[in-house]
From Swiss-Prot:
It comes from Salmonella arizonae (strain ATCC BAA-731 / CDC346-86 / RSK2980). Binds 1 zinc ion. Zn(2+) binds at C9, C12, C28, C32. SUPFAM superfamilies: Glucocorticoid receptor-like (DNA-binding domain). The gene is yacG. This is DNA gyrase inhibitor YacG.
Length: 63
């Protein structure tokens, strides 16, 4: 018995079969994949962090 995993495209929300039949997974198409890449490149998306590092955070490359 083969279970088929289906996910939603992160760009448009269409259902996408997670397998060899969907070469752009988790995206439904090359278009949605490129839209997502463009959002990352334009810094519209970011990975959350605990805070920004600055020169005053008591660290240095010099020892």
């Amino acid at each position: 018995m083969s279970d088929v995993t289906v996910v939603s495209c992160p760009t448009c929300g269409k259902p996408v079969v997670w397998g060899e039949v969907s070469p752009f997974r988790p995206f439904c198409s090359k278009r949605c994949q490129l839209i997502d890449l463009g959002e990352w490149a334009a810094e519209e998306k970011r990975i959350a962090s605990s805070g920004d590092l600055s020169d005053s955070d008591d660290w240095s490359e010099e020892r």
